[in-house]
Structure formats: structure tokens, C-alpha cells
Amino acid sequence: MNPDNFTHKTNEALVAAHEIASEAGHAQLTPLHLVAALAADKGGILRQAISQASGGDAGAPDSFERVVSGALKKLPSQSPPPDSVPASTALIKVIRRAQSAQKKRGDSHLAVDQLLLGLLEDSLISDCLKEAGVSAARVRAELEKLRGGEGRKVESASGDTNFQALKTYGRDLVEQAGKLDPVIGRDEEIRRVVRILSRRTKNNPVLIGEPGVGKTAVVEGLAQRIVRGDVPSNLLDVRLIALDMGALVAGAKYRGEFEERLKAVLKEVEEAEGKVILFIDEIHLVLGAGRTEGSMDAANLFKPMLARGQLRCIGATTLEEYRKYVEKDAAFERRFQQVFVAEPSVPDTISILRGLKEKYEGHHGVRIQDRALVVAAQLSARYIMGRHLPDKAIDLVDEACANVRVQLDSQPEEIDNLERKRIQLEVEHHALEKEKDKASKARLVEVKKELDDLRDKLQPLTMKYRKEKERIDEIRKLKQRREELQFTLQEAERRMDLARVADLKYGALQEIDVAIAKLESETGENLMLTETVGPEQIAEVVSRWTGIPVTRLGQNDKERLVGLADRLHQRVVGQAEAVSAVAEAVLRSRAGLGRPQQPTGSFLFLGPTGVGKTELAKALAEQLFDDENLLVRIDMSEYMEQHSVARLIGAPPGYVGHEEGGQLTEQVRRRPYSVILFDEVEKAHVAVFNTLLQVLDDGRLTDGQGRTVDFRNTVIIMTSNLGAEHLLAGMVGKNSMKVARDLVMQEVRRHFRPELLNRLDEIVIFDPLSHEQLRKVARLQMKDVAVRLAERGVALAVTDAALDVILSLSYDPVYGARPIRRWIEKRVVTQLSKMLIQEEIDENCTVYIDAAPHKDELAYRVDNRGGLVNAETGQKSDILIQVPNGAATGSDAAQAVKKMRIMEDEDGMDEE
């Protein structure tokens, strides 16, 4: 018995049997050990043969394995186990019988199937099969069928891995047609595939198209048509096998093993005489698959059979991979006929979604509204870039269904958030109880109040949730019961059991329908749980994927949008024209009436330095995203050379940094809903503006890697100082403001090309700030200082006289508002810093800033009795206290420190 004359599979089985015997402490290696090793191989031919011999019973191999394990336990064992485990006489006889069968077959190596035939003649193995309820004669017959009608020979050490190669390395799509999703449309593509398959030679279609357009679905549609008989007679009885290239390559550790597997597949296809069609998804993998030194790739094994028409093969690949791999091999390409699968239109996608609706409803246990399917197709086409219909629309529906299912099976988000907040406050409550300082005691009172309010809010919500959950669970149970009864009804109708049919149809089923209708009619308004997937759920998923707010506007959103201009004015002093232009553009976009193929708004802001051009862009980003840092800021002074355009859109192929993408395109691709600020735009090279033309016109830009970036949900703001000197001259009275504005526009038209200016929504000229407006700016800057002081528990009070001093010492009409900030930082913040370090200012005190007696300096006074938190009452004061020169008016800034952090009050600052 020379192991070199055994196949790899046989040797592996003998080694595994030896390990089983050693671990069990058995003195000899018996046929039982060998059968146990072969039965443990889940994909082995013994399990296949037993399953088929018992009429396709999947549990029969496991039953046999249990019987063999029981028999092994009865064998005598030694402890400690013996050093060597020799083969028993019975096993040697089995191998000799197998070798004699091998010689009759003409095999060069002893294969596993011959070894099994030898094992079946052993009485102990036959008894085990009988005990498991399997006929040994049938198992023998199934093993002999494995090699096919012609009795294929094993001529190499890996020859026995290729029995039933199609079953091992592929799956029959015709067999699985009932489990596949229904294919809607694609009739023209399926007909073209059928026509190509019916040719005499080169009868191999290749489906090419973008990822996600439904190439594989065309083949699944063909499989379903074959099952229905809706194909020409030459395709009626064919098997459509999807070849798994990964399984073919996986585990092929010996040279030539991959080619041997593939040849076995092709031989089975050839023997089927046209009754097998291969489907290879990602067919470009065939080119180069298995190629190593001294071996050929899979494509060269396919070519002869493809050309002669002996092999009918359907391929599928994307346009890019077809061009990259297949077109390079002209001999391989000419054997295939191209079938282009185009992206379906939105109406076609809606039809596809309607066809898939039942499958997704059944899987998730939810109900999908038809309007949700329409919205999924429309929103995915409009907002999700870089992917294709119907794939992205199907994914939207799937995720929306999954969200609803998860919400049904878990606590509503509202209750969950309140529970988390309650736990957080309880932890804070326990921590503050141990503190003795004034601020902690004041905060403790506040935490107790918040906890009481939270518990009052949480209790009714929890009760409502439990009631709704019970109702939905009851409806689901009734529906499952109805499905079971309908199945029983169909069975009774087939058996012609009319009494049972009448009993079910007019008794049990009617009762269940009445119960379901009653429970569904109990649904009130403002439900916490919903088992319906509607347009809102789809829009929510789109918003989560893209960051674009496409959800239906809530009451808070409506109030925010209507008051957007007022809230921008709280931060930007003056400039009513610019603020209203930006606010109106955002309003149009969020109402859904903006132009669909252009950015939300595109503006050119003109005016002298320090009047609020950049500040307005930051304020808009803060209002839209609650964070002014979510602003895509491009400083155009960095783009003064022609080659710097590549930094915006990404370096072209072959240049350093090609893989990194552009500074503008990458940020917008990640956050399509953003405010883009091109600062100091007149300083950029003219070539930069050429790239912006298509952004302003079509809302799209192609980056250095050929990807289209969507700018349709961005607000584009350009700022420039062109002609600022004319506006300043108009302000001091040398010209009228109208003449100054005309001069600015002339300057702009000289510098920028007409095609750029013509694409902008609005060119807004910012006026220089008046003395009164600069006072408001000074107050805003002092408010910023007050915020920093409030973090240390210090309140700040500033008189109007102090603001007048600040203005008189810092005002410069040429530079606008920026000198005020510089002066406050240099004088006021420096003085306050000195007072903090010298411990003149302490926690819970108020700093009063007033004009000094000689009017060109500021006077500072500290009151230790005030501060943010009154030590006696525990009440909080405003962080910036306005002290006018005349009678006291209301607070200028209704802002308070909450949890020792600054929380902006919604009312903001009262305008004078």
C-alpha cells in the first residue's frame, strides 16, 4: 500500500481516521475510523451519496454520523493511548478491495469513491447504514453514478475532487428560480440574450453596464422564464449554472489543480450536449485567474470551446472592467456578443420596486406604502450620486424597512434619549451632592428640577409605548395565524375536503379578519410606533446617507427658516440686502421649489474690508448646521498660479497626488449640503473661474479621477474687495452712494468675464458700516469677551459710554469692523487677563467697564457681590449686562451659563 498511489483526498481521509483513533485511545485503525473521517467532511461524496440514497433527506448523513460515533464508543480504548496505531486486518482488506476496483476502472490513483465501495462491503459499515435507515445498495448505486455515464478515470492525485464539478463549483439558477427576487421589465435585454444563445457559434452573450443596473437580474429573469417555459424549444430543458470562480481557485494548492478543476467543469458542460449554460458573474476575473509561472489562465481554457459553440456562456461585468481587462484580450472578446444593460428610468424603477414590494414586506414584517416606493425612486435619482438605479432605490427601501423593524423591536428613540438623559442627570446629582461651593449648589437645585420634569415626561410616554407594542404584537400574531389557516385551506381544497374548507373559510378566517380590522381601527394619532414605511421614512434614510435635509419640514424647521434673516442679523450688523438674498435662496431650496439643476444659491459679495462679507457666510453655516466650522472655505489667494486649479479638482492622471482628490471636490463629495466660501476671489488666476462655470450653471463638477461631484445642494459665496475705494469715497461724501455702486460694478465687469457674472444669482454690494452700526459691532465683540469670562463664572457689565470710548479710539472707516476687535483684544482682554492673574477678579463677581473721567480711557470696577450666580438667591444673571448712560433698559444679551457652559438663548440680542 503505497500512499503515492492514493489521491490527496484518500490520504487526507486516512490521516484524519488515524487522528480519530489516536484521540480515542484505540489500539487499531479500523474501517469505522475511516468512515467517521469521511462522514465528517461536510462537502464530501459520502454525505452526498447517503443524502441522495435516502431521497434527498438532508438529515440522513447526520443520522449515519451519530450511529458511527456510537459504534466507535463501543470499541475498547487504552489510557494512555498507544504510541502507534496500526491498520487492522479489516481495514487492509477494505483497501485491497478498493485497489482491485481501481484496476478495473483503469485509474492511476486510488480515489475516495473506490475506497467507499470497498468500505460498503464491510459488514460493520453495512450494519451502521441499516441502523441509520439507509440502504447500502442505494448508496453503492449513487457512488457509481458520481463518475457520469462514461465512467471518468482518475488520472492524477487530485482527480477525485472533480466528480460532479458543476455541483461543487456552481449553483443551478433554474432550480433556485422560486427563491430569486422577481425580475420586472428587462424584456428587451432577456430577448437579446435568448437570441444570442440560439446562435450556432459564438453563442455567448456578455452583459455590460454600470454597477447596480441589474445585469445579474437579467440572468435571473432568464432562469425564471426557463421554469415557466417562456423560452424557445432549444432552451426549454437547459440548466443555467452560475459558476463560482472563487470556489474554483480556493484551495488549489498543487500545481495544475486549478486547471484540472476547470477542465472537469468544461468536460461536464460538453457532455451535457448543450443542456448546460454557464453564467460567470464578473467575467473579467476569468482573465488571469489561476495564472502562475508555468501554467495558463482560465481564459485560454475557455477560448477553444467558446469559438466552436460547444460551450454556451453568459458573462457579466461593468463597463470599466470590460474596457480594462476584456478588451485587451481581443481573442477572448470576439467570442462574446455584447448586451448593454442601461440604467432604468425613474418610472421603470418604480415598477421594479412595486414588483419587489411583497418580498421586502414579508422579510421585514412591515407594510410599505406605494407612495414610499415612488419617493424612493425620485429621491435616490436626485440626491444619491455615484450609484445607479434601481440598486440605490432598492437599498433605500430596504434600509427604511429595517429602520422601522428595529424601532418596532426596541424602545422608541424619544424614550431612549430621555432615559439616557435621566441616567446622566442622576449621576450628576450624586456628584454635586458632595460639592460645597456656591455654583455647585445652584446647579444641584437645577438638576433636581430637571430630573422631576424628566420623570413627569417619561412616565406617560412609557405607558403609551407599552400599549402600542401590545397592539402591534397582537396584529402580527393574528396575521401569522391567518397565513397558516390559508395554507391549510389550500391543502383542504386540493384534498376536496369540502367540510373543512367551509369551516375555515366561513369560520376561523372570518373571525381573524374581524379581529385584525378591529385592532387596526384602534390606531389613534401621534403614534410612537409605526409598522408602515412611508415617504418620511425614505426621506430620513436619504438625509442620513447624504447629509442633505430632505425630510418633511417640522414646525421648528418652519419657524427657523421664516426667521432665518432675523437670526442672521443678530450676528451680521446691517447689510439687509445681502442677508435677505441668502435667506431667500435657502428658503426656496428647503421648500423644494429651487432650480433642480443649479446650486441653491450663488452670490458675489462686494465691499470694503471688515463689513461682514465672510462673517455672513459663517453665520449662514452656523444657522444651517449649528456649527460655523462646517463651512468649506477656499482662500483664493492660494490659487494665483494657473496650475493651482489642480488643487481644487484633483491632480490629473500621472501626476503626484492623483489618488488624493481635490480640496473642493472631496469636501463637497463627502458633505453635499454645505456652504462654500471663495474668499478674496479677485486674487485667483482666471483659469480657476473657468472650472467654476459648470458648477454655477449645472451644479456639477468632474474631479481629476473622472467622478462627477454634485453641487446642487450647496450655497456658493464669493467675496471680493474690488472697487472698495469708491464705496468709501461715497461714504465720506465725495460721491453719492449710487455713483459709488455704479463705479464698483464697472470695476467688477472689467475684472471678471461676462460668462461668470451671468451665471451668478446675485451680485450684492456691502455698504461701509456707519458709526451706529459699528457700536453694535463693538457690543457683539464685547459679548464674545463676556462668553470667555463666563466660563470662569464672571459676569461683565459695559456702559454705552465705554462703547463710545472703544469706537473713538479704534474707528477707521477704511478697515471697517476689524480694528474694533483688535483694539478690544489688545486693551480690554489684556487688562482683564492681568486682573485675573493678580486675583482681582474671582468667581461670582461682576466686572463693570465704564468711560474714565477724561473720556479717552476705560475704567474697570469689580463688584464681588454679583456675578453669574447670586450666592444668596442662587439666581443667575446675564453674562453681558448692558448699562446705558441714561435710564436702565432691558438686558442686551439674554444669555446664561448652563452647566457652567454657555448656552445661547433663542431670543438672541435685542436690536436697538
UniProtKB/Swiss-Prot annotation:
PANTHER family listed in its UniProt record: ATP-DEPENDENT CLP PROTEASE (PTHR11638), CHAPERONE PROTEIN CLPB1 (PTHR11638:SF183)
Family as reported in the entry's similarity comment: Belongs to the ClpA/ClpB family.
GO biological process, one term: cellular response to heat
Chief location of this protein within or outside the cell: cytoplasm
Positions in coiled-coil regions: 406-502
Subcellular location: Cytoplasm, Cytosol; Nucleus
A Pfam family annotated for this UniProt entry: AAA_2
Residue span of region Repeat 2: 87-149
InterPro entries, sorted: AAA+_ATPase, ATPase_AAA_core, Clp_ATPase_C, Clp_N_dom_sf, Clp_R_dom, ClpA/B, ClpA/B_CS1, ClpA/B_CS2
Gene Ontology CC annotations of this record: cytoplasm; cytosol; nucleus
Segments for region (Repeat 1): 6-75
PROSITE patterns linked to this entry: CLP_R, CLPAB_1, CLPAB_2
Organism: Oryza sativa subsp. japonica
Name of the featured protein: Chaperone protein ClpB1
Record has Cytoplasm as a keyword: yes
Induction: Expressed within five minutes of heat shock at 42 and 45 degrees Celsius in one week-old seedlings. Maximal level of expression after 30 minutes and decrease of expression after four hours at 45 degrees Celsius. No induction detected after salt stress, low temperature, desiccation, or abscisic acid (ABA) treatment. Protein expressed up to 72 hours in Indica rice and up to 96 hours in Japonica rice after a 2 hours heat shock at 42 degrees Celsius.
Region: I, residue numbers: 166-412
Gene Ontology terms, MF aspect: ATP binding; ATP hydrolysis activity
UniProt KW keywords: ATP-binding, Chaperone, Coiled coil, Cytoplasm, Nucleotide-binding, Nucleus, Repeat, Stress response
Domain Clp R: 3-149
Described purpose of this protein according to its UniProt entry: Molecular chaperone involved in heat stress response. May play a role in resolubilization of protein aggregates after heat shock.
Region (II) residue spans: 533-724
Keyword Disulfide bond among record annotations: no
Annotated binding of ATP, by residue: 209-216, 607-614
